């Protein structure tokens, strides 16, 4: 697959995640959750301060035939500043599958359910 095709698939994946999050949080505006341009450094989904209050995540998005959500979660963790208060979240969808999956670190999951 060409690099341009891979980037297009990644961009579409990011846009899908933005739509899902905006639907789940209707109180947020389109400016609160945005897909970042492909090839730019940092998180794949940019969150406004208002959106960060709802979910303090650093989001890494993967979409394709094969990917590793644990490695994607580690990728998000690696770019975060220590003690920033955000949690790394990896989201991914396989080709020909409509279901999105999310991976978080166990300590964050436990914090959510306590």
Q: Can you name each region flagged by the protein language model?
A:
Residues 1-114:
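Catalytic phosphate/metal-binding cores of nucleic-acid and nucleotide-processing enzymes, i.e., regions
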